[in-house]
């Protein structure tokens, strides 16, 4: 038989989803894959129940149902501080993941260099490789996960076509400051580089910090694609509804790839999601307070147990240092498998997020009910005995 594609020789299956499968097999509390165990807003579920009987149930307009795009334009226009045209500057996608893939194909050609900040969400490397591009890594330096502007400029100077930035950052929990984003923006403009922003955690930010949208920085609207989803903000990770926002000339290209990749998003889910997108602004305050509450429970519990970790500025992830618990020669992948099977807690090995050789970090998440978090902390409290 003829040879199959060589592209996926350079990446494996998702470590995050693999850890979910292991957690499910052994009944572990899944703090690996980032999804909540509480319901979406009742208003959205009530609307979905009505839509299940009344429709729509057939193909939508490829770019997304008009009322869905209009609701995105209103909501995002408010937070981004600009008018967004739902007819020419938005496309609905199968989660932010599809938005990122479509964007890479729309902006790059085979062999182009794409800058990524390490640590990074594991999907990015695979997506860049699938687009036949070359990933170029610039480290974020713990514990603040700041970057060296000179190192970033060196990466740009080498001929970068685009940079991928997750803000707030999965897995580090970093929230990029306006000054940091302006530094990146200056380099993007100077070296003619596109900014591909993954902003799915835009409303999960702590301690009075502010999410700054890259496309709001002067000179960046023309070269920025903002990818996001409803998954985190409305606790509907299984609905797989996302979107991209970009200027018309870029959006026209993204829509072409979306059309042939996905045809469209689920019609009944878009209809029900409009209710969420039209929530009053108070919803986002309450949403943020809920996540601050969950963060407090989990981080205080981790401190009491004595497990070192990074305190996130945003997102619902912590990076924990497992150095005290690693056996000699043990990999972080094996540690996480044993943690799920013996301690009953699912985690993600940090090596799947870093380009640098990291073996002592795992990612945990706290988007869970109070009782789930307390149960997980109780199990982690016995980690020394179980491991």
Predicted regions and their residues:
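N-terminal small-domain helix-loop-helix segment of the aminotransferase-like
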Residues: 2-95, 102, 278-279, 386-387
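Helix C-cap/helix->beta junction micro-motif
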Residues: 26, 131, 190-191, 305, ...
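PLP-dependent enzyme catalytic core of the Aspartate aminotransferase-like
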Residues: 74, 115, 154, 328-330, ...
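PLP-dependent aminotransferase-like
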Residues: 86, 105-165, 178
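A short helix->loop->beta-strand "cap" motif at the edges of active sites that frequently abuts
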Residues: 112, 133, 190-194, 221-222
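Active-site phosphate-binding strand-loop segment of PLP-dependent enzymes
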Residues: 140-207
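PLP-dependent aminotransferase class I/II
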Residues: 223-314
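Conserved PLP-binding catalytic core of the aspartate aminotransferase-like
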Residues: 291-292, 305-342
């Amino acid at each position: 038989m003829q040879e199959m594609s060589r592209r996926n020789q350079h990446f494996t299956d998702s470590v995050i989803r693999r850890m979910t499968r292991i957690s499910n097999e052994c009944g572990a509390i899944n703090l690996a894959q980032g999804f909540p165990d509480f319901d979406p807003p009742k208003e959205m579920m009530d609307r979905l129940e009505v839509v299940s009987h009344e429709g729509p149930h057939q193909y939508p307009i490829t770019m997304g149902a008009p009322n869905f795009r209009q609701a995105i334009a209103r909501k995002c226009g408010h937070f981004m501080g600009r008018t967004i045209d739902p007819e020419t500057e938005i496309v609905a996608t199968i989660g932010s993941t599809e938005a990122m893939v479509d964007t890479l194909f729309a902006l790059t050609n085979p062999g182009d260099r794409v800058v990524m900040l390490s640590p990074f969400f594991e999907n990015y490397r695979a997506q860049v490789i699938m687009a036949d591009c070359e990933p170029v890594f610039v480290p974020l330096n713990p514990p603040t996960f700041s970057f060296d502007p000179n190192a970033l400029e060196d990466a740009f100077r080498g001929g970068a076509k685009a940079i991928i930035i997750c803000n707030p950052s999965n897995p580090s929990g970093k929230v990029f400051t306006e000054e940091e984003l302006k530094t990146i923006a200056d380099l993007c403009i100077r070296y003619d580089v596109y900014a591909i922003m993954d902003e799915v955690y835009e409303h999960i930010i702590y301690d009075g910090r502010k999410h700054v949208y890259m496309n709001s920085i002067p000179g960046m609207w023309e070269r920025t694609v903002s990818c996001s989803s409803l998954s985190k903000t409305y606790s509907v990770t299984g609905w797989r509804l996302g979107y991209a926002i970009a200027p018309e000339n870029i959006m026209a290209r993204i829509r072409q790839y979306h059309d042939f990749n996905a045809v469209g998003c689920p019609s009944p889910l878009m209809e029900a999601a409009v209710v969420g997108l039209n929530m009053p602004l108070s919803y986002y305050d309450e949403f943020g307070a809920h996540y601050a509450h969950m963060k407090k429970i989990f981080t205080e519990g981790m401190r009491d147990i004595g497990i070192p970790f990074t305190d996130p500025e945003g997102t619902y992830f912590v990076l924990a240092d497992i150095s005290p618990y690693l056996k000699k020669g043990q990999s972080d992948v094996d540690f996480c498998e044993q943690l799920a099977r013996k301690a009953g807690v699912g985690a993600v090995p940090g090596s799947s997020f870093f380009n640098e050789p990291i073996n002592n970090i795992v990612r945990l998440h706290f988007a869970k009910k109070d009782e789930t978090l307390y149960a997980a902390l109780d199990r982690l409290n016995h980690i020394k005995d179980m491991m």
